[in-house]
């Protein structure tokens, strides 16, 4: 086993997420090495070096922040949010948008020939939003519109280039 974690990056990533719930995974784009891998909140692994007390175990399993879940591997998230950075990148690479392109988020987005509007998590909308703001705010409407402008075939072809729809060959738990 060869560890590829960059300790400085790992420490930096930890500082960014230590009081939050989520995960950070950073890969080297040249060779696929995992250089940072964080799941938060964490817990003291030393609790398990000997027999963990019932009290400590109950604290962990009853913690509403769920520290025993490895969010990077076992977390369950809507795929839309995990695809947003890729949709944005593909639209940039295909010159569909540039980093300053503004798209208005009114809180909902309607597709032609579709009865129900798709809603943004922020009911009142984000207003005019560029790519950077839309990523940091996870603005659904911005990415609905960018995906529509880019087209499903272009998105699908490019996602495949990034490894979507392919086996990872990673030995992950479950």
Residue ranges and their predicted role:
Residues 5, 30-81, 86-174:
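Beta-lactam-recognizing serine transpeptidase/beta-lactamase-like catalytic domain environment
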Residues 1-23, 30:
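Conserved, well-ordered alpha-helix/loop/beta-strand core segments that scaffold catalytic motifs
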């Amino acid at each position: 086993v060869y560890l590829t974690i960059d300790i400085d990056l790992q420490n930096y990533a930890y500082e960014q997420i230590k009081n939050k719930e989520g995960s950070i995974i950073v890969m080297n784009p040249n060779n696929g090495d995992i250089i940072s891998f964080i799941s938060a909140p964490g817990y003291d692994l030393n609790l398990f070096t000997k027999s963990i007390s019932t009290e400590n175990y109950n604290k962990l399993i009853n913690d509403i922040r769920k520290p025993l879940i490895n969010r990077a591997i076992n977390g369950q998230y809507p795929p839309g949010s995990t695809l947003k950075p890729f949709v944005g990148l593909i639209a940039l690479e295909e010159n569909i948008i540039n980093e300053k392109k503004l798209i208005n988020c009114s809180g909902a987005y309607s597709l032609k020939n579709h009865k129900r509007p798709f809603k943004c998590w922020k009911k009142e909308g984000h207003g005019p939003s560029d790519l950077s703001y839309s990523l940091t705010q996870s603005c659904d409407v911005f990415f609905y519109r960018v995906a529509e402008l880019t087209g499903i075939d272009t998105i699908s072809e490019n996602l495949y280039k990034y490894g979507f729809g392919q086996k990872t060959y990673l030995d992950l738990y479950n």
